[in-house]
Amino acid sequence: MKVIGIVGMPASGKGEASRIARDLGIPVVVMGDAIRERVKEAGLPPTDANFGAIAGKLRADLGMDAIARITIPRIEATGAPVALVDGIRGDYEVATFRDHFPDFTLIGIDSSFTTRYRRLKNRGRSDDSLTPEELRARDERELGWGLGRALEQADCRVTNEASLEEFAAEIRALLCRLGGREE
């Protein structure tokens, strides 16, 4: 099974890359879904603070790769020859995926703080940071989980600063090449 991982800072374009993968017929497993489920089970409101607290507790209790280990059966359950995993947050998760899936490729998505903040203001998800300070705090939390080190391990990098159309074309071409699909 070929597994393509996506890593990037909040609002860098991971969700858009996942949407494009789905459009190409590549199943997508979102690591954050495991966190969202646990927040809901705990009866907590779906806020960035609650998602961060639950994710931090899982990592503290079960290890820094806990969410990757929870996600592996979901990836395998797709039964597809190629799947994409969205939302890698740390180098321990990358190591776990590389160990478990010999054919694993990591795509890093880069986007500036200013661009990411503008996107957050426009997309309106419940876990989105609303102020620059909240985004900086979220960035620091995720960097503390090893997100920067995970980005450094990317097999390929895509910069997402231009138009949505340009980013989509670059991601589509990359996913087609990696997934053995025609563009």
Swiss-Prot record:
Belongs to the UPF0200 family. ATP binds at G8, M9, P10, A11, S12, G13, K14, G15. One of its GO terms (molecular function) is ATP binding. This is UPF0200 protein Memar_1556. It comes from the Archaea. InterPro entries: NTP_hydrolase-rel (IPR022970), P-loop_NTPase (IPR027417). Pfam families: AAA_17.
